Amino acid sequence: VAELETIDEERAGSTESCCSPAAQKTCCEPEAKGECCGPGREAGNCGCGVGEVTATVPEDAAELRDTVRDRYAKAALAAGSGSVTCCDDAAQLTEGQRELFGSSLYDSDDREALPEAAQLASLGCGNPTAVAALNEGETVLDLGSGGGIDVLLSARRVGPTGKAYGLDMTDEMLELARRNQAEAGVENVEFLKGTIEDVPLPDDAVEVIISNCVINLSSDKPAVFREAARVLTPGGRFAVSDVVADEDMDEVTRDDMGQWTGCIAGALTRADYRARLEAAGFDQLEIQETHRVHEHAASAIIRARVAP
């Protein structure tokens, strides 16, 4: 694996977020009610954002998947309504996190071409469409397509003779993505319901796979990579943005459900990413870190190829 030099820039977030003192006063005062102000979320500890301990990671894979699905269903509903909820860490990013995740990581020209709801629903850690080197006429699959931001951008790049598939397991995200597709007026797109561990496409169906901060959420990553290799044509390209963990990530972080749904706890180390991709039949692996997202993790671009 070519591990290129880490770009670790300082990113300062706005203090005017759902966890600002003003928000805490109205949302997390003792008499406040509702999900965002439940036990343990007193003033000064709203529970906003990635990293707040609310539960441990379940051992049951189905339960873990349901928890992830619930978080992203909330995110879809929030993005679709254009609303910002106070201290709902399950569905919103703070302003500081928006510097590390979401649509701020895309060029302004790309953002301007997309519906606002697609931008609001973006919870990714990079811009895989910028590094996938998509060509006119290619077929591309986005694993965990969410509100459709990367699918819509990919559809523009492959043109009318190409096609972009989006795969997601969350009904609310699929509904939002299809609305965004209609608003954007893009026709060479199809959104599919399913999981990234069991892709509902035939063998050799696509030439490129992209994904944006999703593979870390899976409890069965070897299955994800096997399915990616299966649906890619021989020589097909794998170009994803994902979080990679440092070797020294502690067990407390690994066992925190909030850190898992926040794309940290389930992240593979660089060595694990390489080993599991190679086991699935990929070669020409490259990992390029882009920015730090946690004390023990970074966002990275991972590129590979299915051996011809």
Region annotations inferred by a language model:
Residues 45-103:
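N-terminal auxiliary segments of SAM/dcSAM-dependent transferases
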Residues 88, 92-139, 150-157:
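Conserved alpha-helix/loop element of class I SAM-dependent methyltransferases that forms part
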Residues 125-128, 135-198, 223:
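Class I SAM-dependent methyltransferase SAM/SAH-binding core
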Residues 207-220:
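A short SAM/SAH-binding and catalytic strip from SAM-dependent methyltransferases
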Residues 222-237:
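A short glycine-rich, Lys/Arg-flanked "PGG" loop and its adjoining helix->strand segment in the class I
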Residues 245-264:
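Short, glycine-/aromatic-enriched active-site segment of Class I SAM-dependent methyltransferases
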Residues 265-280:
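Short alpha-helix
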Residues 280-308:
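Core SAM-dependent methyltransferase catalytic element
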